[in-house]
Amino acid sequence: MNENKASNRMWGGRFASGPDAIMEAINASIGFDRKLYAQDIRGSLAHAAMLAETGIISTEDEKKIAHGLNTILSEIEAGKFEFSTRLEDIHMNVEARLAELIGPAAGRLHTARSRNDQVAVDFRLWVKEELLRIDVALGGLIEAFLVRAEEHAATVMPGFTHLQTAQPVTFGHHLMAYVEMFGRDRTRVRDAVERLDESPLGAAALAGTSFPIDRHMTAKTLGFREPTRNSIDTVSDRDFALEFLSVSAICATHLSRLAEEIVIWSTSQFGFIRLSDAFSTGSSIMPQKKNPDAAELVRAKTGRINGHLIGLLTVMKGLPLAYSKDMQEDKEAVFDAAETLDLMLAAMTGMIGDMEVNAAAMKKAAGSGFSTATDLADWLVREAGLPFREAHHVTGRAVALAEERKCGLEKLALSDLQAIHPAITENIFSVLSVGNSVKSRTSFGGTAPAEVRRQVRYWKKRLKRDASLEKKG
């Protein structure tokens, strides 16, 4: 039998009895949305200031509210605030404490506001701040890549397709491929900030309010570009949270691909890199083991972030306008994805800066698998005037012969090559070394060391430009 506890709830006026204990448990979000305390208080301070400015509440009440809210902020940050599940969420917890501190004036704070627009502004502020943190972290990761790419602009390694040796490339060029990926991730982060940079405050429950509020004032106070333009849309959607998860999932996928390569490169079979003790662990039974656990966990945690994206998409897919309590499920997904991605970015930045490169092993592997076969075909087109399809066929025969002789293309005798095609001359051997192969790939974006260094210079300038944009913003 339920005790009548409805009257002391902020929404309990029309209820004759209080909720069941199970209802309280499933309804409460304070266990996770307490993370929004700073944003909630910030939004309330802006709302109270606007209410006073527009004459909706008195200046005296606004001062009491502001003092009380700042007191609550200090209590939470000092670990002295007692959160209550009975009060459901961060909004009600803060408001209840405010009433204890300043009395009836606290009841004026929620004028012209609903929890629907209140939570939307809290969450947007939090996501915006997290996106800006990710932006900085991505900048740091790119910087770590640039240092290593410049260092290894001429370090030859095998390039792969289908994880089979394809053509020689440089390690610097390979690393710069990830710079491009993470650069696009950073662009997506900034695009997401641009789209969510609208203030929901003032949309109220869904229809706006009859009070003469100034939504542009609160938007400016909270650092938003402008207020949202449709009050129903404002409280109905969480596409900014979905976009955050999408951006995070794409970035995590790039991190996972890199982590997979680090795992492969660090095996004794490849031996391309050696991870430091700082990012490795050992085995409880095999004394010789040095396991790339940090990279493996980066790879694994990508699935966690992808799961959060699919989960929230599924939550949102069938909701009618406007607000539904289903949307309470948005925050844990975003909070966990953000924490996970922050950790992944930090771990990867450390591994890239810390790894030891075995250039000799890379170069040796680059010469295997007939990796300069394309150079042979290109030489036949360029020097002998053959159509590329014919050159491709001739080169295939040369590869088959080398495979039969169990040697590299560069070890075949000139007479053997001329027996395949008479136009081949001794000059062919100049293009069959892996070093000359990478030097010849001078096309824009190619693997030639000079071109890799140009790519590095471009990205250094771009990082400086992006940093200056941050300061202007």
Curated annotation (Swiss-Prot):
Pathway: Amino-acid biosynthesis; L-arginine biosynthesis; L-arginine from L-ornithine and carbamoyl phosphate: step 3/3. It comes from Chelativorans sp. (strain BNC1). One of its GO terms (molecular function) is argininosuccinate lyase activity. GO terms for cellular component: cytosol. It comes from the Bacteria. Its main location: cytoplasm. One of its GO terms (biological process) is arginine biosynthetic process via ornithine. Signal peptide: none annotated. This is Argininosuccinate lyase. It catalyses: 2-(N(omega)-L-arginino)succinate = fumarate + L-arginine. CDD domains: Argininosuccinate_lyase (cd01359).
